[in-house]
Every structure is written in C-alpha cells, then in structure tokens.
Amino acid sequence: MSVAASVVNLGEIELQSGVVLPNLKISHATFGTLNASRSNAILMPTFYGGKHTDYEAIIGADKALDPSRYFIIAVDMMCNGLSSSPSNSDAPFSGADFPKITHWDNVQAQKKMLEQEYGIESLALVTGFSMGGQQANHWAAIFPDRVERMISWCGSAATAPHNWVFLEGVKAGLLADPTFSNGTYTTIPEAGIRAFARIWAGWGPSQAFYRHKLHQQLGQETAADHMQEFWEPNFLAFDANDLLGMMHTWQVANIADNDLYQGDFEAACNAITAKTILMPCETDLYFPVADNETQASLMSNVELRPIPSVWGHIAGAPGLNPVDSAFIDNAHRELLSS
C-alpha cells in the first residue's frame, strides 16, 4: 500500500480562543490517488492517543476504505505530537504554554490544509473513531455543504457531563505526580502517566470485557497484565502536555460551541445534511448509545447503528479485533455505495 506522509506549514492561524499561533503545522498521510474531479476524497481525523498510522489497519484493497477507489487522508489532530503540539512547538508556545485547542480549530486547520495542498473543497466521506468521530461531527455541522457522508464511531457531537467527569479523574492521576511540575517537567512524569493509564484501563473496555477475559485475545493473561502491557505503554509513548492538550479538546467538544451556532445544539444537529451513520458501541462507558440517540433525534438522513460488542469503547479501535472491525468496515461499505 502506497502511503505518502507529510507535515504542512499553514502559517499564522488565529485559534477559536483568539490566540494567534504562528507556523501551525498539520501532519497527515494519504492513501490512493485524487481523481480529476477531486470527488473521491475521504478524511479520517485521528483519535485520543492515536496517530495517522493507526488507521492503516482499516485501509486496504480488501476494505471499504480502498485506496484504489478513494483518496484517503488520515490527518493528525493538534496536540497528538505530530501536528502542532505542546511537545513540538517553539517558545512562547512550547510545553505548558501551548494554547488550548478546540475541534473548531482542528477542522478549520484541516480545511485549509485540504484546500492549500490538494484543492479539495468537498469530501465524499468524513469518518473517525472516538475524537475522530467528534471531528467528523464538527466537519458535518460547520461545513454541511462540503461533506457528503459522515460516520462517527464510538464518538459524539458533544462531550457529555459524565464523560467530562471521567476525564477529570484520569487527568488528576497525572497531575498528582510532583514530577509533572505544572507542565514544566524536565524528566518524564512516569508515575503520573502510569496512574493515568491505570485509571483509563477501567473505562476503555467494558466490565464484560474483563469478565470474559477478552484481554487474552490481545496477549495479556490477566487484567493486571492488560493494564501494564496494553494501557501503560500506549500512554507512556506520549508527552504529558500533549496528553493534557488532547484531553482539553475532548472535554470542551461541542459542535454548537462556536459563533456559527452560539450554543444551539439542536440547530447544529439540524444543519447536518450529510448521509450519516452514528455507531456507538453498546457497552461504551463514555460515549453511550443514549447520547447518540439524542443526536440522531435532531438530525435528518441519519442511521443509528450501535456496535453489538462487549469490548466497550475499544470496540472501535482500528483493527483491534476482527469482529468489530468487520462491522465497522461493513457500515463504511454500505454508506459509500449509497
């Protein structure tokens, strides 16, 4: 599979907060070839703790996301360590001084990158897992005339209060490490990140995932092994300020929280015209089906298709388990053929 990865410097960008960020960079990878009419573009924004390479597991000639048919752009959201982030920015915006990012900022930067680099003004599909699904929702609400189809799996249009509380708890585990030093650390706050990961381990999978010892399918014999061998390495691979930067974006996510909709969530949902499939997992502990039901009730041209899985939120993790990945692939295949 031919993959082209690059980092685009978009120059000076004013963020939703009013902060002007110089030399904003967007990292992405492309798969396939853009056709002459530029009508075969698919955008896949990344998720929390994810990078563009993670989507490679669900892209291929035998998949709905087929590079021989579509031009697929997997784009790194800000704060993930590849696009502009606390860890890779120069003073005065380095580390803890990096500005707060919203999904409005992510999608505006992605729009500029697509136009500047590829001349793309419309998308056949915007799709993503978790925070990638949140960005897909933002795209469809903010640019309804540019998005033909949208899939959000294990995601939401707005972060619910219970989800926000979960994230506050995880954050507290990291902040409690004195090494973190208000984000000015000179050595990795390893104890804090490990605590962060262990709290997360109780929320990413469902209760039934542990009850049925499904972590053994991932190579971890016990629940303790799963925490230490799956969750801890995943988060230790990230800079601590990057983790908190992405978390802020997640906590404040809301498609209506902008000048366009001025807090009117119903109006923002009503504005989405893209053919849409919302795919929460039946056992997701932080993006529950009920939240997606509320969103779907405010939209037209939408199907609510819960993932029938006991893997919880990680049912949507790209390529993590074959059954759920096939369910997600089938939804993409159906929507792209419509």
Please identify what each model-predicted range represents.
Residues R146, S152-P233:
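Alpha/beta-hydrolase-fold enzymes
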Residues G49-Q134, H138-A141, D145-A158, H162-L167, ...:
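Gly/Pro-rich cap/lid or specificity-loop segments adjacent to the active site
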Residues E229, G245-A268:
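Active-site nucleophile elbow and catalytic-triad environment of alpha/beta-hydrolase enzymes
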Residues L21-T33:
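A short loop-to-beta-strand scaffold at the N-terminal edge of the catalytic core in hydrolase folds
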Residues N258-F265, A274, L285-L298:
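Short alpha-helix in the alpha/beta-hydrolase fold that links the catalytic acid
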Residues E293-A296, N301-S338:
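Catalytic active-site module of serine/aspartate enzymes centered on a nucleophile-bearing elbow/loop
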Residues R38-G49:
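Short beta-strand element of the alpha/beta-hydrolase
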Residues I272, L278-P280:
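Short beta-strand/loop motif that positions the catalytic acidic residue
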